[in-house]
Amino acid sequence: MTDNLFNRTELLLGSEAMERIRSKRVIIFGLGGVGSWCAECLVREGIEHLTLVDSDVVCVTNCNRQLMATTKTIGQPKVEALRTRLLEINPQADIIALQKNYSEETASDFSIETYDYVIDAIDSLKDKISLIIRTLSNSPLKGENQRSATEVEANSLPLREGWGGSFFSSMGAALRIDPTKVRVSEFWKVKGDPLAAAMRSAMRKHKMFPARKFLCVHSEEQPLPNLGTALQDGSQTFNKTRTNGSLAHITAIFGMTLAGLVIQDINKQS
């Protein structure tokens, strides 16, 4: 039954690319409105080795935008609810569910070097920066190797030996409604996104910069205001500075664009 699951993918990309897709290892941090759609798209296109990372459980307020969130999955760990769905698509896939949060304290729990692709769909500013810093082999440069933020923005820091995989990140998808404004840009060139601006400001303040450039999915639409009162959004609500409104068609575009970046990159290798 599963022999022809990816026939249409192979028709477009070819058998060599299909084999590469099957062999790649991907890890997604954050399974909200962006990460959950990214995961499904990757599995539907042939990724067979996928690790899902999120500490939260499905909440009723997730149902408007998160793929695995239904009235039947409320209260279930997000990683388990999504894993169940993905295995219904491809029962032979190797889907690892890790119900934990990525942070400075837990960073050593993840063997990033074993993955070909790392997808950042984290909401928390601090944890997001930590993932970028650690994955892209950052440390403060001292002495003659120290560079200014301006130089980093222009050229990025030199690539150091170490992890050779690819890193893709999602900027803010909340408070947007226009699907035609979604873009892909190098991190230091993202404009009009408050999250990216806050991340760059924090990196400059602490003199911690990515060792190489990476692509982000973002929106050029100016964030709209919240008009209502936010209800509790899972166990992570009170770790956020605030809870913003968001829509499935935007978060799904972000997630699927991240998946598209992975598939494009694999296809180029063929």
Regions found by a protein language model. Give the residues of each.
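N-terminal charged helix/coil linker that caps or initiates catalytic domains
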Residues: 1-27
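Glycine-rich phosphate/adenylate-binding loop
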Residues: 2, 110-117, 122-131, 167, ...
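Conserved S-adenosyl-L-methionine
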Residues: 44-49
